[in-house]
A protein has these predicted regions:
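Extracytoplasmic/peripheral linker and loop segments enriched in polar/acidic and small residues
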Residues: 110, 395-406, 431-498, 519
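Ligand-site clamp/hinge motif
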Residues: 225-270, 395
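Surface-exposed binding/hinge segments that line
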Residues: 102, 147-190, 212
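Alpha-helical secondary-structure segments
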Residues: 126-133, 160-164, 206-207, 234-236, ...
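Gly/Pro-rich hinge or "lid" segments in bacterial periplasmic/extracellular proteins
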Residues: 88-92, 179-232, 236, 351, ...
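Structural transition elements
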Residues: 8, 323, 327-359, 377-379
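Long beta-strand-rich cores associated with HINT superfamily self-processing modules
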Residues: 356, 494-519
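N-terminal lobe/hinge region of extracytoplasmic solute-binding protein
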Residues: 55-104, 135, 203
Length: 519
């Protein structure tokens, strides 16, 4: 028989009170005189019909697409750069910088480029720029994981408009990677001449270019009048750096910005109820999972794992921890991706959980240390699962460490259990299942060769129907083995003025700004 966890609901009230009293620290301001950059001149631009103004939650570390992994940095990249291919509204790959592409064999992608594309500095795009971009991406610690398939040594520039991209192994998601803004094509000559400058004033082929960057305040873009493709509908774009979420919302309400990024959960309903604003929200590609360390007792016992899973009232857990802004996970990756299969959620059943524990040899339960790091979400999650597991006699002793310690413990397999929400780089199961390769040293440690065999088959099979069958078999097996518990699909929200058109939610949290118009 199902029942709601009264302890979990009570915890919600306690947590809300604690958070209401929490103080927020302020980030130190950057002195433009010390940074060697121009001081802001005049007032910060207000939202207007000829310009687009966007409030960011932080300052980009870099505009070099291979020197960061932050989603709002990539939002700028959609204006500055182009990719070889892109995807249309139906999910089909269509030309962008490339006019033609073909797999001539499993390890060779033959690509022909447009001959009318020029960078912001007036130089023409060539296949040398493409090879340099892919070489850079594969070597960067920020992007190497999604370019592991790329073979720089055997990739060949045929002529200025033609390149044979070589793969180290067959990889079905190659075009998905190349269509991502994480594959933005950079200017080889400019990048090599001054890598430091490229982080702040990158040279791309996109519809806008960087004009000014005032540290701690704003980044200004102007239209590229010589753009080869469809021009954007605004002459200027300004990224305003507004760290406080409440201030971003106020700026949106008062017309100071057209779009606000990463709204506070508490402001979502406020935006929805305002007829002059629109909440643009949806599920992200990411998923939060409760991971068991399957290499240590008692978590190496499938009956224990199943017992702990059945003891979780996921509906209450997600409601409490994500404050109503996430959905209970039904499977092992986002439902929008190829081959998704709804496997759960697993039934909440305390009596069954107790029976499974007894069958596993733990009729009186057991105790263990649950280690997490200090964020509101992590601490609340730890407290709620602690309460739920206590109902079946399992004592989870909560240990709070700093992020660096947590990361080190996870990477060395020292956590007993953990809430992990890995960032998914591309919308493909080969990337979404990032926790599962057997070679990873994180605390999941399933050491199950069958999983690795299915992962390899799914990522290397080019036939889409076969890929679906493989990934669905894998999801069935993951559900059966209960190495993890899929918990939540987090949602994400932007706010926009009602007169902003063409601003569409993207599950990777990187909306395409080139489609936006104002007024």
């Amino acid at each position: 028989m199902k029942k709601r966890s009264s302890r979990a609901i009570a915890l919600l009230l306690a947590v809300v009170m604690v958070l209401a009293l929490a103080a927020c620290g302020e980030e130190p301001a950057v002195d433009p005189a010390e940074s060697g950059e121009p001081e802001p001149s005049g007032e910060t631009p207000a939202a207007s019909g000829s310009g687009l103004v966007i409030a960011l939650p932080g300052e980009p570390q870099s505009l070099d697409p291979y020197a960061h992994s932050m989603y709002y940095n990539f939002m700028a990249a959609t204006l500055i750069f182009d990719t070889l291919v892109t995807k249309d509204a139906d999910g089909n790959y269509v030309p962008e910088l490339a006019t033609e592409w073909e797999f001539t064999d499993d390890l060779t992608l033959h690509v022909v480029l447009r001959d009318d594309v020029y960078f912001h500095d007036g130089s023409q795009l060539t296949a040398d720029d493409v090879k340099f971009t892919l070489d850079t991406a594969a070597a960067s610690s920020f992007s190497s994981s999604i370019f592991a398939w790329y073979d720089p040594d055997n990739t060949t520039v045929i002529d200025p408009q033609t390149i044979d991209i070589k793969l180290k192994y067959a990889y079905a998601a190659t075009l998905e990677v190349l269509a991502s803004i994480r594959s933005a094509i950079v200017n080889k000559a400019a990048y090599e001449a001054d890598p430091a400058s490229y982080t702040r004033t990158p040279i791309g082929t996109g519809p806008m270019k960087v004009e000014n960057w005032y540290s701690g305040d704003r980044i200004e873009f102007v239209k590229n009048e010589d753009y080869w493709g469809e021009p954007v509908a605004f002459d200027t774009c300004t990224f305003r750096i507004i760290v406080e979420a409440s201030t971003r919302t106020i700026e949106l309400e008062t017309g100071g910005v057209d779009i606000a990024v990463d709204l506070a959960y508490s402001d979502w309903s406020r935006i929805e109820e305002n007829p002059e604003l629109v909440l643009v929200s949806g599920r992200t590609d990411n998923m939060a999972s409760l991971v068991f360390n399957n290499s240590i007792e008692p978590f190496n016992n499938i009956l224990v794992r199943q017992a702990l899973a059945h003891a979780l009232d996921l509906e209450s857990l997600v409601q409490v921890c994500w404050e109503g802004t996430a959905e209970v996970a039904e499977g092992y990756y986002a439902s929008s991706m190829l081959g998704f299969k709804a496997e759960g959620p697993r039934e909440y059943n305390v009596e069954l959980a107790k029976e499974l524990l007894a069958e596993a040899g733990y009729p009186d339960g057991f105790s263990f240390t649950y280690t997490t790091y200090q964020t509101n979400l992590n601490q609340t999650f730890a407290q709620v699962v602690q309460s739920m597991w206590a109902e079946i006699g399992v004592e989870a002793k909560i240990e709070i460490v700093d992020l660096a310690t947590f990361t080190d413990m996870n990477n060395n397999g020292q956590l007993t259990t953990a809430l992990l929400t890995p960032s998914v780089a591309i919308s493909d199961p080969s990337a979404a299942l990032i926790l599962w390769p057997i070679t990873r040293t994180i605390s999941l440690r399933h050491n199950d060769q069958h999983i690795q065999d299915l992962l390899d088959a799914g990522s290397s099979t080019y036939d889409e129907a076969e890929r679906v069958e493989i990934y669905q078999e894998l999801q069935d097996y993951l559900y059966e083995m209960t190495y993890t518990v899929p918990v939540a699909y987090p949602t994400f929200a932007f706010g926009a003025a009602a007169d902003v058109q063409g601003f569409n939610f993207a599950s990777n949290q990187i909306p395409d700004l080139t489609t936006v118009s104002v007024g």
